[in-house]
Amino acid sequence: MATKAIKFYATWCGPCKIYGKTWTKVEKELTDVEFVEVDIDKDTSGLAVEYKVDSVPHTVVLKEDGSTNAKTGRLNAQELKELILF
């Protein structure tokens, strides 16, 4: 399993819209990472509940070795890269 970055967002969330641009930029740069986006209002997979998402935007990173990292709030490109590459 490759490193996976999961972004939890909502379409009505202003900071999520801004963060989406940063997410797309970093996604293009880190091609070895799987990027997943989950709209919390349409999440039928239960991921938002599993990762205890209570505010958006919220980012969860799952590493190959099973370790995880998470942060709530809008991140800039450098912060997102640091979260993913911890």
Language-model regions, residue ranges each:
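Typically the conserved alpha-helix immediately C-terminal to a functionally engaged Cys/Sec
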Residues: K17-L30
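Non-catalytic, surface beta->alpha helical segment in thiol-disulfide oxidoreductase systems
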Residues: S55, V60-F86
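Short Fe-S-cluster ligation motifs
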Residues: D43-S55
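Short alpha-helical
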Residues: G14, K42-D43, Q78
